[in-house]
């Protein structure tokens, strides 16, 4: 404790940025902005992409506009992100500065985050995640709410209607004044989600009068128990006194009621079985920022609460028979202090101290357990020091030292080094390189879940090396922006849940994994004519993720094989053509084969998931009147009606349609562009 107090005292004079970037006064502004990104491999998603249409979750946006692999089996189903072939728990996520990874699972379900609620998303790849937080062995995602980009008031309503009795509604009211700003957003979505599909996991035999099989076919079935209702409410309030002080408050409530779809190999009738999950989440962050000529400091505090109830029962002859019931409650408290100091235009110093308190209570009723699962609390302390230096104009270096404490256990020091060099200034052509050591501490379920939790687990350890180039070429009517990066990562003591001899699953440190590969990101835009514009974004990732751990027994054939559900190749393209008040958009994604077994068995039908290509198309028309802006947008998902699966025995929807109507009343204030 004495050691931690000394570390905390050394970091207390410092705190973090507010929701949007605030410039420091004087010459330091230019230097600080250039130095901040020294050596970082990152990509950003702005509001144009995030606010594409109201039916999109952040999982949909990341699937179509990033190199991340989103493991999901449809809308309103659990959607986790995998950076560079790592585990979903290796992706750390913050919202307005507060980490929102589940303390139980260590992951984030991106399907529960409406993209309309996020104003800016930044992805930190590999070692660059150390700039934001620890534990991101694959990377980190930073989500922010920003001051509304309007002058005066904005009222917006969006109504969406789609296939499978799907309805989406979005309401926003924003105000931006000289000192006070407010942004209120509401989302309501509901759907039966009962799409039909050809079940390739079942076969029906047709017999003649003698009982001989004449032919067989795969039956057409409906997605059972896939219904959902999602409700979200977000309130952001910002205050700027004009004298260097800013305050922000963000409060977000969400309710989800979701049926859990039956497997395609399931023969049960959904009228007899109920399989659903109810979830309530509350998140809040309060921040205060003070800016002077060479200092910028922020103090943040936050609280998050979540309860999840899972119910699986049968109802026969009016009698309910419980099979499994589980409920969990989590409480998270958060405090942060951070500051940046610019002693000279060539130097930038940063320090940060954070404290989290996680409380988890889990209760299960199942064949294995009939009472409280576990009830645990844990303190976490995080501290970091960062220094950035530009000795000569084209060259910059940065160093980060991070330390974390979980309960009474200290994580070894996590260092990171970054460097970049400007190769050609007119094109903003920059070479970047970095190396970092990172650790991730086990989640609460890893340690305490009953049955199976393992309190003796060691933290996962990773070394990551990154190198690449980025560029931004611009002319009067054309822009080409992009990056190419190569990475090499080694993760030891990978935590893996495996079945034991007692009939349940248990985690252990069993794997050594080698992740390596390349990432390519491109953005292009051109002004064709006065009223015509074309743009394109493209992403590609090559991510071998190889198990190099010792075989657990003589029959273990997993050594040297690709990890389960990790595609080696993934790519996406988004093209948009605008002409006057019309817009046409096309999106394309591809994933290579994914193995479902650690031994990569391809001889079995269930041993691998076939590669697939997916296309979406949308057309939009904007209308502008004196007192109203409006638009109508029609979307075709799965344009080519591709038959595919992303998770074994989880069918996906075929071609389906959505239409959105957006209305924006206008006041005398300056209108916001569409």
Language-model features: where?
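Periplasmic-side early beta-strands and strand-to-turn transitions of outer-membrane beta-barrels
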Residues: 151, 175-275
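Short acidic/polar hinge/loop motifs at secondary-structure boundaries
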Residues: 98-126, 451
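A beta-strand signature from Gram-negative outer-membrane beta-barrel systems
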Residues: 115-156
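Extracytoplasmic beta-strand/coil segments of soluble accessory domains associated
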Residues: 59-102
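N-terminal periplasmic "start-of-domain" segments of outer-membrane beta-barrel proteins
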Residues: 24-53, 80, 88
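Gram-negative outer-membrane beta-barrel transporters
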Residues: 391-396, 485-490, 509-598, 629, ...
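Membrane-embedded beta-barrel scaffold of Gram-negative outer-membrane proteins
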Residues: 294-312, 360, 424, 431-432, ...
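Surface-exposed extracellular loop regions of Gram-negative outer-membrane beta-barrel proteins
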Residues: 257, 307-309, 407-413, 419-466, ...
């Amino acid at each position: 404790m004495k050691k931690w107090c000394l570390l905390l005292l050394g970091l207390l004079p410092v705190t973090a940025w507010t929701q949007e970037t605030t410039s420091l006064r004087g010459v330091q502004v230019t230097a600080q902005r250039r130095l901040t990104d020294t050596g970082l491999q990152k990509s950003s998603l702005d509001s144009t992409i995030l606010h594409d249409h109201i039916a999109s979750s952040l999982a949909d946006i990341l699937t179509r506009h990033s190199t991340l692999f989103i493991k999901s089996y449809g809308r309103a189903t659990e959607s986790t992100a995998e950076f560079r072939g790592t585990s979903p728990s290796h992706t750390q996520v913050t919202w307005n500065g507060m980490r929102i990874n589940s303390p139980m699972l260590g992951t984030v379900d991106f399907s529960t985050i409406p993209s309309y609620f996020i104003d800016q998303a930044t992805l930190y790849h590999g070692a660059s995640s150390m700039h934001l937080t620890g534990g991101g062995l694959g990377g980190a995602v930073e989500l922010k709410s920003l001051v509304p980009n309007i002058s005066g008031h904005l009222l917006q309503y969006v109504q969406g209607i789609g296939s499978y009795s799907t309805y989406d509604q979005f309401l926003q009211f924003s105000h931006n004044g000289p000192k006070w700003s407010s942004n209120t957003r509401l989302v309501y979505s509901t759907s039966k989600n009962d799409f039909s599909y050809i079940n390739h996991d079942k076969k029906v035999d047709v017999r003649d009068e003698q009982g001989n099989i004449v032919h067989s076919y795969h039956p057409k079935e409906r997605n059972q128990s896939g219904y959902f209702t999602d409700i979200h409410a977000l309130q952001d309030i910002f205050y700027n006194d004009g004298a260097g002080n800013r305050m922000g408050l963000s409060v977000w409530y969400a309710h989800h009621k979701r049926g859990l779809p039956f497997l395609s190999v399931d023969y049960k009738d959904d009228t007899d079985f109920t399989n659903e999950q109810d979830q309530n989440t509350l998140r809040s962050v309060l921040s205060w920022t003070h800016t002077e000529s060479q200092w910028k400091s922020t103090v943040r505090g936050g609280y998050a609460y979540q309860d999840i109830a899972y119910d699986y029962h049968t109802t026969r002859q009016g009698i309910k028979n419980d099979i499994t019931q589980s409920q969990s409650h989590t409480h998270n408290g958060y405090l942060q202090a951070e500051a940046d100091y610019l002693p000279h235009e060539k130097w930038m110093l940063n320090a940060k101290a954070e404290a989290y308190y996680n409380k988890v209570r889990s209760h299960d009723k199942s064949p294995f357990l009939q009472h409280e699962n576990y009830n645990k609390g844990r303190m976490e302390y995080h501290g970091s020091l960062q220094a950035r230096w530009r000795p000569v104009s084209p060259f910059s270096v940065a160093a980060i030292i991070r330390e974390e404490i979980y309960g009474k256990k200290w994580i070894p020091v996590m260092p990171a080094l970054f460097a970049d060099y400007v190769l050609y200034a007119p094109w903003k052509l920059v070479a970047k390189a970095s190396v970092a050591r990172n650790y991730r501490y086990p989640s609460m379920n890893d340690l305490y879940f009953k049955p199976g939790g393992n309190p003796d687990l060691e933290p996962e350890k990773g070394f990551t090396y990154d190198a690449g180039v980025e560029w931004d070429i611009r002319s009067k009517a054309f822009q080409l922006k992009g990056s190419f990066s190569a990475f090499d990562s080694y993760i030891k003591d990978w935590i893996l849940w495996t079945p034991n001899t007692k009939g349940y699953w248990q985690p252990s440190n069993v794997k050594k994994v080698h992740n390596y590969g390349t990432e390519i990101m491109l953005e292009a835009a051109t002004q064709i004519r006065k009223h015509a514009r074309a743009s394109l974004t493209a992403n590609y990732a090559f991510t071998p993720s190889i198990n190099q751990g010792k075989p657990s027994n003589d029959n273990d054939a997993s050594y040297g094989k690709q990890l389960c559900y990790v595609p080696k190749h993934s790519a996406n393209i988004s093209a948009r053509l605008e002409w006057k008040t019309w817009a046409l958009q096309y999106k394309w994604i591809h994933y290579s084969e994914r193995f479902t077994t650690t031994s990569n068995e391809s001889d079995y039908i269930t041993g691998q998931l076939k590669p697939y290509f997916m296309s979406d198309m949308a057309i939009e028309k904007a209308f502008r009147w004196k007192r109203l802006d409006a638009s109508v947008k029609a979307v075709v998902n799965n344009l080519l009606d591709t038959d595919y699966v992303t998770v074994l025995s989880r069918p996906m929807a075929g071609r389906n349609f959505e239409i959105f109507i957006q209305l924006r009343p206008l006041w005398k204030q300056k209108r916001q562009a569409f």
